[in-house]
């Protein structure tokens, strides 16, 4: 039972933060009824009083900060109430039944989705991590607010990671970079993704982080006048053309630089988009007009013009990217997008969140399509290690953009093959594929696809997948579908062989399998610790 002094200290600190939260919510969504939020605050205050975090702060500060992040996303009162309650089941005596009774089914469903399964239920930490992620992703499908709370929770935990011992910092940072940063990326939430990744990099590789930070900071100071000059030139040209736009400059985030240096084996001086300018226009037409203007001023780098407006990324990110070479030979990236596109790039699925009767917008459904696919692909993966490794591939693939003959875009992992393409179209197309044409030319099934390839799959009825395909495919969908098919057909073959062996042995004792009742066969299987006669036959076969 907390002392009176502890209760007073907790109340004094948290009341101020709660008032800030309410002000933010009133500002963002003035017509919302905040009664459920106030009730959730009082409930959390009651049950978390006396608890402290590793920083020494009252524990309730954490749910309040999570709620503040959600308020910054302009989330609804139900989401923010769930944010205030998100640790109550995990860290207090409160149960989901209590939450449901006090706050209703919606809040209870969300809180249950973000609550970790007890560690007691698992043999290893890896198994616990895999099952908790699987649970969260299944809950996300029903209510995206589950993952938005989880991201807000992880963001505040990363912001306060300094208070934990180094070994825990490393584990949490690694999981953040492998799972939560990529999830934010997949949902188009660039702002949160960037902060999560930089914080993860800082704690996972503190020496590498500091070295890169010092190099980039030196470049930033050297480049301040250069950036001002570039902005001034663009503003002047836009004014001459009668285009109203916002022009700002930025330096690429540290983790993004780090990944590029690793992937391309280059130095910081060779990073084309270390410095970048962002031009935010009022209309789509102005985006393309601005692109023409900057190409008239500076020479574009061949192969560095990317039109993500005409062909959005899978997370629906839209922008024009171009790299140019300035008069003094400095490479420089310019991103051009509308205000609406910029909001979507920064906030992603949270940008237009309008929750109504449990439904999301068509655009948000498109964003969540990848999640539904991932859950489907992982359904048959029981091994925790395999689940985690394939999930990481699915969350953060290096993507290539290919096309069907009818022009439909098919996004695949880098170095994907026609087999991957076939399985992405349909499972049966994958199972029966015998060949492929890429850009009108016959290619082997091991052929590596590239962005822009037009792929036609050739199929043959009755054809079956080959085990050799597992060493060729790159997508987890293809790998899991092939494994699933092989497992089913291997089992069928094993049952057939086992049945023949049992019949042969039984005949020695003048016993005929066809005369045995199902209960007799089940009893024999049970004696060997097996659930069904087919399990017995498969084991023998």
Protein language model features and the residues they cover:
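Short hydrophobic/aromatic beta-strand micro-patches
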Residues: 280-282
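Metal-dependent phosphohydrolase cores
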Residues: 1-142
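Internal insertion modules embedded within essential enzymes
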Residues: 8-18, 92, 96, 104-107, ...
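Solvent-exposed beta-hairpin/edge-strand motifs
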Residues: 295
């Amino acid at each position: 039972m907390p002392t009176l002094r502890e209760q007073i200290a907790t109340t004094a600190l948290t009341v101020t933060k709660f008032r800030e939260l309410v002000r933010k919510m009133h500002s963002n969504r003035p017509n919302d009824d905040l009664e459920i939020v106030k009730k959730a605050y009082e409930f959390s205050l009651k049950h978390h009083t006396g608890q402290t975090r590793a920083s020494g702060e009252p524990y309730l500060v954490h749910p309040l900060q999570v709620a503040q992040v959600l308020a910054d996303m302009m989330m609804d009162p139900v989401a923010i109430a769930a944010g205030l309650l998100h640790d109550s089941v995990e860290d207090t005596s409160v149960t989901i039944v209590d939450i449901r009774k006090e706050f209703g089914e919606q809040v209870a469903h969300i809180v249950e989705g973000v609550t970790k399964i007890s560690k007691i239920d698992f043999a290893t930490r890896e198994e616990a991590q895999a099952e908790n992620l699987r649970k969260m992703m299944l809950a996300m499908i029903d209510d995206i607010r589950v993952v938005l709370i989880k991201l807000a929770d992880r963001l505040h935990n990363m912001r306060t990671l300094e208070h934990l011992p180094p070994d825990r910092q490393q584990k949490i940072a690694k999981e953040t970079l492998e799972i939560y940063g990529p999830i934010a990326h997949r949902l188009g939430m660039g702002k949160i993704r960037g902060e999560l990744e930089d914080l993860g990099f800082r704690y996972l590789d503190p020496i590498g982080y500091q070295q890169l930070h010092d190099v980039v900071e030196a470049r930033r100071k050297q480049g301040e006048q250069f950036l001002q000059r570039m902005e001034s030139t663009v503003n002047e040209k836009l004014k001459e053309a009668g285009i109203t736009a916002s022009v700002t400059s930025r330096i690429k985030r540290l983790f993004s630089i780090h990944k590029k240096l690793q992937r391309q084996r280059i130095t910081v001086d060779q990073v084309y988009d270390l410095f970048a300018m962002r031009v935010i226009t009022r209309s789509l037409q102005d985006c393309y007009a601005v692109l023409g203007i900057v190409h008239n001023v500076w020479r574009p780098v061949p192969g560095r013009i990317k039109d993500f407006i005409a062909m959005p990324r899978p997370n629906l990110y839209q922008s024009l990217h171009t790299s140019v070479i300035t008069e003094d030979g400095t490479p420089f990236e310019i991103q051009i997008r509308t205000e609406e596109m910029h909001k979507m790039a920064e906030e992603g699925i949270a940008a237009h969140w309008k929750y109504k009767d449990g439904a999301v917008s068509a655009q948000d459904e498109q964003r969540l399509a990848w999640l539904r696919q991932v859950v489907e692909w992982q359904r048959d993966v029981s091994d925790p290690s395999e689940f985690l490794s394939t999930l990481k591939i699915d969350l953060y693939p290096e993507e290539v953009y290919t096309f069907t003959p009818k022009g439909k875009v098919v996004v695949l992992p880098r170095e994907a093959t026609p087999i991957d393409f076939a399985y992405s179209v349909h499972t049966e197309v994958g199972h029966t594929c015998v060949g492929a044409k890429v850009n009108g030319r016959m290619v082997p099934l091991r052929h590596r696809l590239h962005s822009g390839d037009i792929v036609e799959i050739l199929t043959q009825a009755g054809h079956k997948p080959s085990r050799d395909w597992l060493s060729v495919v790159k997508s987890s969908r293809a790998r899991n579908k092939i494994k699933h098919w092989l497992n089913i057909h291997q089992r069928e073959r094993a049952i057939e062989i086992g049945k023949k062996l049992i019949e042969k042995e039984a005949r020695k004792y003048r016993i005929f399998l066809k005369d045995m009742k199902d209960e007799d066969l089940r009893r024999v299987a049970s004696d060997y610790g097996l659930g069904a006669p087919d399990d017995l036959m498969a084991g023998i076969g």
